[in-house]
Amino acid sequence: LVYQVVQQNLQAIGINAGIKSYDESSWLDLRKSGEMDSFIATWTMDYNDPANIMYTFFGSAAKTRIRSLNYSDTEVMARVAAASGITDDAKRMAEYQALERKIVVDDAAWVPLLGSTHLFAIGDRVESFIPYWAGFSNFYVNDVTLK
């Protein structure tokens, strides 16, 4: 359904997009080759820092070829590399916000579509349960006690 909604939204602004399905091996080969015009994929951050997204997707020409549709703005790539070295938290976050605005809003090189909701049922006897920050629902439970 997501594919059809994206296709309809693109058609509404005059872009004709087709939908093709591939087996995983072919899909990965196409991504690595740089011959795929666009794709929808899922991804979850490994650690809670904007560098995790920016560097993974836009840290080099090779990363953008494999993960981000051959985005070729070398100035952005240089800024991504430099941002990880900024030690002032406010300046670092401001740079990552500016990079996100450039990549997502100005260039539309990456379009986040949705986020997952994870629900947890906790009994009255459970103490100190803290879900993993990224929302994974398939994680190990440590340091949880019962009353």
What are the residue ranges of the model-derived segments?
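Solvent-exposed, acidic/flexible segments
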Residues: Y3, E24, Y47, S68-M77, ...
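Short, solvent-exposed loop/beta-turn-alpha elements that line the ligand-binding surface or hinge
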Residues: L30-E35, Y55-G85, L114-K147
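Conserved C-terminal helix/tail region of periplasmic/extracytoplasmic solute-binding proteins
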Residues: N9-Q11, A17, S84-G85, K91-A94, ...
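Hydrophobic aliphatic residue packing
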Residues: V6, I13-I15, I103, A121, ...
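Bilobed periplasmic-binding protein-like "clamshell/Venus-flytrap" ligand-binding domains
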Residues: F39-W43, I86-D124
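Periplasmic binding protein-like
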Residues: Q8-S60, E95-Y96, P112
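Bilobed "Venus flytrap"/periplasmic-binding protein-like clamshell domains
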Residues: L1-Q8
